[in-house]
């Protein structure tokens, strides 16, 4: 069973993902894969270097993620090129891990699950949701960005309404951690029951 887990920035995906990991689910983390692929000499690192030269790299060869992110927000052409490089490489690695490590319950932790069409390889999708105002407040505290930057990031993602309409299950993470975990437990049991049927 392959289950996608997604949600807007600062919605609490990691909190929920950690709960599922504690239950023994096999977690495939798209952000972690992306970081691995941009390590010096990695497949995406090589492609970024070939396309952008040294302009987005530190002197030691590491990718300057903050600079690249800023360029992507201000230039649609750069954003599209970076996505053309990243998304196929991340998808290929996710598919490789699914096939190499078959598991009764594999959770794909993918922030841009719908934008990258990875929901199509999932049997079910869980969306972690919070109101946009709370998303902005949490993101400002967590990421050290200002409110305008958070609004820009949110606007660059699929709309909350669209994300919710594509979900099989929704976790409301706007209350206590205990309440979020309770929802995780209920959804986990429902998915296991469906898988057993």
UniProtKB/Swiss-Prot annotation:
Key word Manganese present: no
GO annotation, cellular component aspect: cytoplasm
Keywords per UniProt: ATP-binding, Coenzyme A biosynthesis, Cytoplasm, Kinase, Nucleotide-binding, Transferase
Pfam families (alphabetical): CoaE (PF01121)
Annotated InterPro entries: Depp_CoAkinase, P-loop_NTPase
Annotated ranges, domain DPCK: 2-197
Name the record gives this protein: Dephospho-CoA kinase
């Amino acid at each position: 069973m392959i289950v996608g887990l997604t949600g807007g920035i600062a919605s609490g995906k990691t909190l929920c993902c950690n709960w599922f990991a504690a239950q023994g689910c096999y977690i495939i983390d798209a952000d972690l894969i992306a970081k691995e692929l941009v390590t010096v000499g990695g497949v995406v690192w090589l492609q970024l270097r070939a396309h952008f030269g040294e302009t987005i790299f530190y002197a030691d060869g590491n990718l300057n993620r903050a600079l690249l992110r800023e360029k992507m927000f201000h230039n649609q052409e750069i954003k599209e090129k970076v996505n053309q490089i990243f998304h196929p490489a991340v998808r290929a690695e996710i598919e490789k891990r699914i096939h190499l490590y078959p598991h009764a319950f594999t959770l794909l932790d993918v922030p841009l699950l719908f934008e990258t069409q990875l929901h199509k390889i999932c049997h079910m999708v869980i969306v972690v949701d919070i109101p946009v105002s709370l998303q902005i407040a949490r993101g400002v505290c967590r990421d050290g960005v200002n409110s305008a930057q958070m609004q820009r990031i949110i606007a660059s993602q699929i709309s909350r309404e669209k994300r919710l309409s594509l979900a099989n299950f929704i976790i409301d993470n706007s209350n206590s951690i205990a309440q979020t975990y309770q929802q995780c437990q209920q959804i986990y049991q429902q998915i296991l029951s469906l898988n057993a049927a």
